């Protein structure tokens, strides 16, 4: 490793093909068959088109060889390509910008990165119109599936590593409150639903997953009832509070039209609130690091406003 030097052109196609060739020699069902690609993604020799790269990655994914990517560098970093080929390779993508981030990905999270415990994980959430007028999923824009693809085991979806959790956040407009969409001309079935046996359900959650990539999917179903409802964000679980803090910070950075008057300081306050619980484990300091990031963004805001 110490003898490697970065120079000259980058032939990502040949590098991947060589890696797949070597992985094929030891390919074994039930084992970890994964390629770890470290690059800035600036491929200037051979295939550089994202779609063509994904075809190569998908073909080997279907043979049982996964691909994870680590992004390095700044100026020529092809973040989009790195994420896409990792997503389509049943892998993970991480950007390494510091020694601490490298330690987090390659040490603290190594088990989760390489050990997949659930394949092709799909989440489907149906809201009860008796309680919810509007909703939007925050994030996952490039991972959305058509409704009919949920039950199709041939459709590729996300992988879940050992010890990892996935958060899906929805912003909703409760029934009767002002929303972003104009009222419909024709009546809906809200009144009928309000009188049925499911009127205490806010929504219904379905999860599909495969124990192994080759297995048939298993279905989990769970009603989300009014018992699960919290009167305010401050009374929510600390992990939920932190997830909302991170999501709102990202929306603020993107200048989302839905963020309204939410400021960086609001994300800081919510993250600090989640850290105030003794049950929260932040041994690696990652959540504290996020708080520092929100504070830095707030400090830089006046400079950005002047530009």
Range-by-range predicted roles:
Residues 37-39, 71, 125-127, 171-174, ...:
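Flexible glycine-/small-residue-rich
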């Amino acid at each position: 490793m110490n003898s490697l030097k970065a120079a000259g052109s980058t032939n990502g196609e040949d590098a991947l093909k060589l890696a797949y060739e070597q992985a094929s020699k030891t390919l074994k069902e039930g084992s970890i068959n994964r390629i770890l690609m470290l690059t800035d993604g600036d491929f200037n020799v051979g295939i550089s088109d994202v779609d063509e790269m994904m075809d190569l990655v998908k073909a080997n994914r279907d043979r049982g060889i996964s691909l994870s990517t680590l992004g390095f560098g700044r100026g020529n970093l092809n973040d989009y390509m790195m994420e896409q080929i990792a997503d389509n390779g049943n892998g993970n993508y991480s950007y390494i910008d510091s020694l601490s981030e490298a330690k987090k990905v390659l040490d603290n999270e190594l088990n989760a990165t390489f050990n997949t415990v659930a394949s092709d994980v799909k989440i489907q959430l149906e809201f009860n119109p008796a309680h919810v007028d509007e909703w939007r999923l925050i994030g996952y824009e490039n991972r959305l599936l058509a409704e009919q693809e949920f039950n199709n085991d041939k459709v590729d979806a996300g992988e879940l590593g050992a010890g990892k959790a996935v958060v899906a956040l929805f912003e909703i407009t409760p029934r009767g409150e002002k929303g972003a969409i104009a009222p419909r001309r024709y009546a809906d079935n809200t009144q009928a639903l309000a009188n049925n046996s499911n009127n205490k359900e806010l929504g219904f959650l379905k999860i599909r997953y495969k124990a192994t990539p080759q297995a048939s999917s298993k279905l989990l179903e769970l009603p989300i009832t009014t018992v699960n409802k919290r009167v305010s964000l401050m009374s929510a679980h600390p992990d939920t509070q932190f997830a909302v803090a991170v999501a709102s910070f990202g929306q603020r950075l993107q200048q989302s039209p839905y963020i309204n008057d939410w400021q960086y300081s609001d994300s800081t306050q919510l993250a600090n609130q989640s850290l105030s619980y003794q049950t929260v484990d932040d041994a690696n300091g990652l959540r504290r690091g996020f708080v520092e990031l929100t504070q830095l963004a707030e400090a830089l805001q006046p400079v950005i406003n002047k530009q």
